[in-house]
Amino acid sequence: MTGLRGYESGVVTNETHAQVMRQATARRATLPALLTDAGYQTRAMGKMHFDLVRACYGFESMTLPIDYLRSCEKQGQRPKTHGAMECELVPALSTVDTRDSINTWIVDGSIDFLETRAPLRPFFLWTSFTKPHPPFDPCRDFWEIYDGIPMPEAVYGDWSRDLDAAPQGFLAGSYENTDVHLYSPQQLANTRRAYYAMITQVDYALGRLFACLRENGLDKNTWVIFTSDHGEMLGDHHMSQKNLFFEGSAHVPCLIMPPRGRGLPVNRRVDTLAELSDVYATILGIAGVTPPENTHGVDLREPYEERTFYGNSLDVNFCVMDGGYKLVYSACGDHTLLFDMVNDPMEQHDLAALPAYQEKRRELFRMLLEHTAKTRPQALENGYFRTSPAPSRPGDVGFRWLGFHYHDFNYDVFH
C-alpha cells in the first residue's frame, strides 16, 4: 500500500498500521491514492485487513467481507459456524456450497465491477480472496477433487526433526495458535489436502475473472499481477502459519501477466529475489506514475540485480539474505540459523554451528544488527536484539482462543 517495507513504515504487526496509513493517505502516497489522483477508477473487493475497517486509504470504492455477511443476513442465510477456530488447521468442510462461498462472492463482485466500470477511465481493481487462510474449510466439491491423491510430506531438517531439541523460539508462535506439532502424518496430509482445495477454488475463481477480461476486450490493455501477503508453514519443521522467514511462510508467488497481443515477453521465470514493495513500484510504473522519493521498490518488468534482503516480523523474527545465504534470527530464545539456499532450498541443514561457516554467520549477523539499528532501533537494547526467553516445551506457551469461524473480527479479516 505504501511502497515501504514494514521496518521502514513501522508496520511490523497487524495492530500498528492505522496511523501510518492515515498519514500516507493524507500525503496521497498510498498506491490507490496515487492511482486515483492519476485518473484511475480504483476499486477494492474482498479482504483488506484495514484499521479502521471502512477506511478506504485512497480507494474510490471498497466492498469487504463484512458486506458478505450483511448480504447473507438480509437473505436470512448467514453461514453456520462449524466449530473450527480462526487459526485452526484441522480441516472442517465449509457449511455453504461453492456458489454461496465468500471467495465466489468476491470474484462475483470483481466481475460486476469490470462489467459496470466507467468506460472512459482506466481502472485499478484489487481482488483480495480470504482463502486459503485458516480455518481450513474448503467447499466440498473442491475437497473431493483431491480424494485419494497423495499429499507432499512435511519437511524437517537436521535442526528441526527432533522437536525437543529444535530452537523453540521459532516454534513459540505455532504453539500459541495451533497444535500442529502433535499432528500425525495423516492429519498433516488432510491439512494439506484442504489447503490445496482452497487454492484450487481461487484458481477457478481467477479463471472466471480472466474470462470476463477476454469477453469484454480488456485482456489486450490490462496487466494482471497475482501475489500474496504470506504463505503457510503447513507443518514444515513442526510449524504453522506465518510471521516466519522460512520458505513456507515467506516465499510467495508473484505472477505477472502482460496485456495480450502486444508482443511482450511471457512464460519467463525470474529467480532474482523480489519483495512486495516491488509490486507497488511495478504498478506505478505501468500507470506512468512517479513513486514517492522515500520508496525503494523496483519495477519488476525491467531486469534488475540481486539485492540483499532484510526482514523483520513482530520485532521478534528477523532475516537477512545475501549471496545465496539466508540467516534467520529469533529474539525469542536468541536463536540463529544459517542456510545455503542454493544447495539447500528447503532449509534442512543448519550451518550456523559449523566451523567452516563461522565467518559467514558473523558477517550476516553483523549486517542484520547494523541494519536493524538504522531502521528499527526500538527492536534493540544496549546494541543487541531485545531478547526474551524461549519456551522449553510446547506446554510453556498458552494457547490463544481466537473465536469461531464467521466471527466478526476487529479488522474485518473474516478468515
Where in this protein do the model-derived segments appear?
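Formylglycine-dependent sulfatase
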Residues: 1-330, 336, 345-366, 395-415
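Conserved histidine-centered catalytic loops in small-molecule metabolism enzymes
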Residues: 339
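A contiguous, mid-protein "functional segment" used to position or interact
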Residues: 355-391
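Residues forming the ATP-binding cleft of Hanks-type serine/threonine protein kinase domains
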Residues: 342
